[in-house]
């Protein structure tokens, strides 16, 4: 991967990545390993995203011209009982980062968001232009992530409308990358299913929630590529092609693991589909998490990012085979 299309105004100032220890954060570290640009990765111990003073201290210390925010309060069910913390991390923290980029460093801001900003107002794939919410039908997590998106857009729109010469000359830009069903290096649905498949002879998996499984490695690559591009600011749906249910994903992952030599107890016919109502949880989950990726495809094609856009199945297959291979070696 190349960062050659991104013209850093001052290469002594590092790219700042928040969320070092998450699945996307770990993938970003791997992506940046071979790129000769200074990068600083921050975790919870380095910056408290619920504390504005802590964020500002880090921003003033490093003075970044590029921020990639892969951090979030993602404990969806816990957020129902901790709304203030969820909003601090998911709304106020990215607002502070966006203000710094738009008004002080005049650089690039990449922010990862979620399918949880939608509340089943469509039965087909959502476009970036579709109305989000309604807010009263979203989980606390969804509300806080949507509020973060809106805060970022407001900050950049106000900076642009101000007509400040440095903003216009230096092309401050933001990219909000909405995604869904992320998996990578860390705890996730696929790893849970593979573990349970080795322990049980029957599984019950929700079949009436539909979305797009997305590789954290691919998400990291897309985020870096967008930061290094000259494409238009805005929201982009960053998901592969295709769609499936949680049940469909479980079946595909387990069958792939079995073919790769992983010992599994459960047979495909014993992975039973159930409705989400049979598995009640504190926070609301969208039944429809489909998101159209056509806008992102067009942007990436203009950058010659890839000759072929990925399908979720090929990404999951590669992930499972790599995971099984690593497990067999250990």
Question: PLM features: residue spans?
Answer:
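N-terminal Rossmann NAD(P)H-binding glycine-rich loop of SDR-like oxidoreductase domains
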Residues: 6-31
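Catalytic helix-loop patch of NAD(P)-dependent Rossmann-fold dehydrogenases
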Residues: 88, 93-96, 117-177
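NAD(P)H-binding glycine-rich loop region in Rossmannoid oxidoreductase-like domains
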Residues: 52-91
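NAD(P)-cofactor binding segment of oxidoreductase domains
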Residues: 81-110
């Amino acid at each position: 991967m190349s960062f050659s299309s991104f013209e850093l105004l001052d290469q002594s100032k590092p790219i700042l990545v928040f969320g070092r220890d998450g699945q996307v954060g770990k993938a970003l570290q791997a992506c940046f390993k071979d790129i000769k640009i200074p990068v600083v990765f921050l975790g919870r111990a380095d910056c408290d995203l619920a504390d504005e003073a802590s964020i500002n201290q880090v921003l003033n210390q490093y003075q970044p011209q590029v921020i990639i925010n892969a951090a979030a309060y993602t404990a969806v069910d816990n957020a129902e009982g901790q709304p203030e913390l969820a909003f601090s991390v998911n709304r106020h923290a990215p607002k502070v980062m966006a203000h710094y980029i738009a008004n002080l460093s005049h650089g690039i801001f990449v922010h990862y968001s979620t399918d949880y900003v939608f509340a089943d107002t469509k039965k087909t794939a959502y476009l970036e232009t579709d109305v989000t919410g309604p807010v009263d039908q979203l989980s606390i997590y969804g509300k806080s992530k949507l509020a973060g998106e809106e805060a970022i857009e407001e900050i950049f729109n106000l900076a642009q409308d101000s007509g400040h010469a440095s903003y216009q000359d230096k092309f401050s830009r933001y990219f909000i990358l909405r995604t869904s069903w992320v998996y990578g290096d860390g705890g996730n649905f696929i790893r849970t299913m593979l573990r349970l498949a080795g322990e049980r002879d029957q599984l019950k998996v929700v079949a009436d929630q539909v979305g797009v499984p997305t590789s954290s490695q691919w998400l990291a690559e897309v985020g870096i590529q967008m930061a290094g591009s000259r494409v238009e600011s805005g929201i982009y749906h960053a998901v592969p092609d295709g769609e499936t249910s949680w049940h469909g994903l479980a079946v595909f992952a387990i069958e792939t693991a079995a073919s790769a030599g992983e010992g599994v107890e459960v047979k495909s016919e014993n992975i039973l589909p159930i409705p989400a109502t049979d598995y009640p949880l504190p926070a609301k989950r969208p039944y429809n998490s489909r998101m159209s990726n056509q806008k992102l495809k067009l942007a990436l094609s203009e950058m010659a990012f890839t000759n072929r856009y990925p399908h979720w199945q090929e990404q999951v297959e590669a992930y499972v085979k790599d995971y099984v291979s690593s497990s067999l070696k250990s």
